[in-house]
């Protein structure tokens, strides 16, 4: 929950992103792009265009909708989230200039490896705390496509 969001935000800041200029917290995607006056064609193709993301990040070439969570145990919530985010990732592939990112971690994944593997197959932008420590947000600045 909030601890994971705070951790992710600390890495955004560490990578030089500034709140409101470069990223928004708990923001609807369409509100964020309107606020920044960015054109994201075909956004309506994504069922979740009205979705509130934990973070919306913008770089020169890309807008990222970022969801974060940490699972201390496995279960149906983890499974449903994995399926939902995999679908969101598939829809996002058709939207030039937008990438969906899922940052997740926790020991709950130890017993749900199949769900995580399935999510990875359709969503190439699944990251964990180790990826944050290794500067994944620095790489976003240079990204020109959906993952």
For each feature predicted by the language model, list its residue ranges.
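Short, conserved beta-strand edge motifs with alternating hydrophobic and charged residues
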Residues: 22, 66-68
């Amino acid at each position: 929950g909030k601890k994971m969001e705070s951790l992710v935000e600390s890495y955004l800041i560490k990578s030089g992103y500034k709140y409101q200029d470069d990223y928004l917290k708990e923001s609807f995607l369409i509100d964020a792009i309107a606020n920044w006056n960015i054109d994201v064609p075909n956004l309506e193709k994504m069922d979740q265009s009205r979705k509130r993301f934990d973070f919306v990040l913008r770089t020169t070439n890309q807008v990222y909708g970022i969801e974060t969570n940490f699972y201390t145990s496995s279960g149906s919530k983890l499974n449903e989230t994995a399926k939902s985010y995999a679908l969101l990732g598939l829809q996002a592939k058709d939207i030039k200039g937008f990438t969906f990112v899922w940052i997740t971690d926790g020991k709950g994944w130890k017993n749900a490896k199949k769900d995580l593997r399935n999510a990875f197959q359709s969503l190439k932008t699944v990251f964990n705390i180790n990826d944050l420590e290794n500067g994944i947000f620095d790489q976003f600045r240079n990204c020109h496509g959906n993952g």
